Amino acid sequence: MANLKTKYQQEVAPALQKQFNYKNVMMIPRLEKIVINVGLGEAVQNAKALDAAVADIAAIAGQRPVITRAKKSISSFKIRTGMPIGCKVTLRGERMWDFLEKLIYVALPRVRDFRGVSPKSFDGRGNYALGLKEQLLFPEIDYDKVDKIRGMDVIIVTTAKTDEEAKALLKGLGMPFAER
């Protein structure tokens, strides 16, 4: 299923090298990793919510997520240091390419009233962040087994130095950016 990787190697990388006049092939921006994060405020009261989120993310990513814990105690949120408050998974290599392909060609087209992802979500260092409102966008999630709709953050980390280079990379891979 790594068609996206071959597309990158055969089409996107040479096009980027030409567009930005890179002298060395190692200067061409490439994907480093994709981080999927789910923050769960309700995990404080409901421990089963965390297990369900972990199972969902494991199904989507094909890799077991790590549970994230609170760094500080915050009394207004009723959390203490070390309490589980979410989960995240870092994808690299083949799994990263598989997930990106699934995100671009399956999950994003399923979003209601989808007009493209925001071109403003770059962080200034060539990384792209994107929020999804529900886990049902992915085909691995069975609608009948979902206890609660949860969103997730997807962070695409690239080796690009600027946002312009990162946008050209993602656009070349088929990321549907919204036109202003």
Curated annotation (Swiss-Prot):
The processes (GO biological process) annotated in the record are: translation
* GO MF annotation list: rRNA binding; structural constituent of ribosome; tRNA binding
Keywords tagged on the record: Ribonucleoprotein, Ribosomal protein, RNA-binding, rRNA-binding, tRNA-binding
Keyword Amino-acid biosynthesis set for record = no
Q: Which SUPFAM superfamilies match?
A: RL5-like
Query: Pfam families from the entry?
Result: Ribosomal_L5, Ribosomal_L5_C
Gene Ontology cellular-component terms listed: ribonucleoprotein complex; ribosome
KW Chaperone (keyword) present: no
Q: Which domain of life is it from?
A: Bacteria
The record, for InterPro entries, names: Ribosomal_uL5 (IPR002132), Ribosomal_uL5_bac-type (IPR020930), Ribosomal_uL5_C (IPR031309), Ribosomal_uL5_CS (IPR020929), Ribosomal_uL5_dom_sf (IPR022803), Ribosomal_uL5_N (IPR031310)
**Subunit and partners:** Part of the 50S ribosomal subunit; part of the 5S rRNA/L5/L18/L25 subcomplex. Contacts the 5S rRNA and the P site tRNA. Forms a bridge to the 30S subunit in the 70S ribosome.
What job does the chain carry out? Answer: This is one of the proteins that bind and probably mediate the attachment of the 5S RNA into the large ribosomal subunit, where it forms part of the central protuberance. In the 70S ribosome it contacts protein S13 of the 30S subunit (bridge B1b), connecting the 2 subunits; this bridge is implicated in subunit movement. Contacts the P site tRNA; the 5S rRNA and some of its associated proteins might help stabilize positioning of ribosome-bound tRNAs.
The record's comment on protein family reads: Belongs to the universal ribosomal protein uL5 family.
Quote the protein name from its UniProt record.
Large ribosomal subunit protein uL5
Which organism is the protein's source? Answer: Symbiobacterium thermophilum (strain DSM 24528 / JCM 14929 / IAM 14863 / T)
The gene that this protein is the product of is rplE
